[in-house]
């Protein structure tokens, strides 16, 4: 059973989330030859103040 974890900045709409999980599910089924009901996805919102790159918080850019 494929399990996909997606971490992204907060602020995406419910419609964007629906589209994302649909497309991730479709791609996973195509690539791995599994059925959609075996694909699990967890979406995690992260505030920019809790995410950094190259030693800088995204909230500081």
Descriptions of predicted regions:
Residues 2-61:
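A domain-level signal for the structural core that forms small-molecule/cofactor-binding pockets
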């Amino acid at each position: 059973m494929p399990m996909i974890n997606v971490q992204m900045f907060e602020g995406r709409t419910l419609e964007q989330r629906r589209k994302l999980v649909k497309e991730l599910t479709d791609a996973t089924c195509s690539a791995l030859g599994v059925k959609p009901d075996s694909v699990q996805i967890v979406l995690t919102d992260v505030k920019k103040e809790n995410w950094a790159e190259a030693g800088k918080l995204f909230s500081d850019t």
